[in-house]
């Protein structure tokens, strides 16, 4: 572990990490302090230059024409639905196996979530989507669970057939791809979270919406800042969901210096686990597909004695959740 520890770490000293087992995601904090100090000295706290740079960096990372920074991943979902005029009387197809924010955003927008079951890889079963479509359906919201992309070719094809929007909950998949293409190419928008739990994390909350559609991006830039076109003119009613400049500085540092290594290590760790666990007949892992680049925000296994194994792992200082 010593290669992953910050320079401030002393032997036998416990480094408290609430949200991640990867110490590297929370290392280099003395260097990040310097980036934050630059922001403080400029007093540029709201939609500052670091935010502009962060949006450019994130757009490049995700292959998108436009990246709109927002306050958190939940707002990213909600604001996208609002910008697409999805609300009361509308239905949005998604999955029940997800964090509450996915469904919460749909309900808060005034729409009704319609659930489609997941497959063995924990992602939406694309072959069951069409049966869930009604006259009220306005969008499909696939959730790329645990860092594994959904089968977007089929989902996007269905969406185009029925003229539906596609809003991808991409909170777990920064750096992932589908058939060597960026996920933003399969729908209206992808939404991301930079919560401390995520592969790309800031020191608090942060989120992003990426899209290739200029009209959608322009509306989102307005909605995330009260609908203000400038200081005195409001074009639409919006929200206060700006990514603050300090968090943008943290994100910029991590995109430049940390994210690639974090992704590589997660893939390497998962590959090792796949290899070692394949010899254990009591453990079932997710089948890997060549056309999917996974980034392993989580690593899933299935066992019969789930609770017993969880207790054993935790007792041996290996975090495990159900």
Task: Kindly give the residue locations of the regions a language model identified.
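Conserved PLP-binding active-site segment in aminotransferase class I/II-type PLP enzymes
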Residues: 1-83, 87, 108, 160, ...
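PLP-dependent aminotransferase class I/II
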Residues: 3-4, 22-23, 51-56, 64-67, ...
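PLP-dependent aminotransferase-like
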Residues: 4, 82-170, 177
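Short, solvent-exposed beta-strand edge segments and adjacent coil->beta transition regions
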Residues: 14-17, 204, 294-298
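Structural detector of well-ordered beta-strand residues that form the stable sheet scaffold
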Residues: 68, 93, 114, 166-167, ...
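Conserved SAM-binding loop
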Residues: 69, 94, 115, 209, ...
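Conserved active-site segment immediately N-terminal to the catalytic lysine
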Residues: 168-203, 230-235
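Short beta-strand-to-turn element immediately C-terminal to the catalytic PLP-Schiff-base lysine
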Residues: 192-193, 207-212, 252
């Amino acid at each position: 572990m010593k290669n992953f520890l910050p320079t401030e770490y002393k032997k036998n000293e416990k480094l408290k990490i609430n949200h991640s087992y990867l110490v590297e995601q929370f290392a280099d904090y003395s260097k990040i302090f310097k980036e934050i100090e630059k922001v403080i000295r400029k007093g540029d706290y709201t939609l500052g230059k670091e935010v502009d740079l962060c949006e450019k960096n994130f757009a490049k990372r995700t292959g998108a024409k436009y990246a709109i920074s927002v306050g958190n991943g939940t707002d990213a979902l909600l604001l996208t639905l609002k910008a697409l005029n999805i609300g009361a009387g509308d239905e949005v197809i998604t999955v029940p196996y997800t964090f509450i924010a996915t469904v919460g955003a749909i309900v808060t927008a005034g729409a009704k979530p319609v659930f489609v079951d997941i497959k063995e890889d924990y992602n939406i079963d694309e072959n069951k989507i069409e049966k869930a479509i009604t006259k009220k359906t306005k969008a499909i919201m696939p959730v790329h669970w645990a860092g594994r992309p959904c089968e977007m070719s089929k989902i996007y094809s269905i969406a185009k057939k029925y003229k539906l929007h596609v809003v991808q909950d991409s909170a777990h998949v920064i750096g992932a791809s589908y058939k060597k293409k960026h996920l933003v190419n399969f729908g209206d928008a992808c939404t991301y979270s930079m919560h401390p739990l995520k592969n790309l994390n800031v020191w608090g909350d942060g989120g992003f919406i990426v899209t290739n559609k200029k009209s959608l991006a322009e509306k989102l830039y307005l909605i995330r800042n009260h609908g203000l076109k400038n200081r005195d003119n409001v074009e639409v009613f919006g929200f206060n969901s700006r990514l603050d400049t300090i968090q943008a500085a943290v994100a910029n540092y991590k995109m430049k210096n940390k994210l690639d290594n974090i992704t590589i290590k997660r893939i390497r760790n998962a590959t090792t686990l796949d290899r070692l666990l394949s010899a254990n007949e009591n453990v079932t892992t997710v089948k890997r597909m060549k056309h999917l680049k996974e980034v392993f925000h989580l690593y899933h296994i299935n066992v019969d004695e789930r609770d017993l194994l969880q207790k054993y792992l935790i007792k041996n200082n290996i975090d495990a959740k159900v």
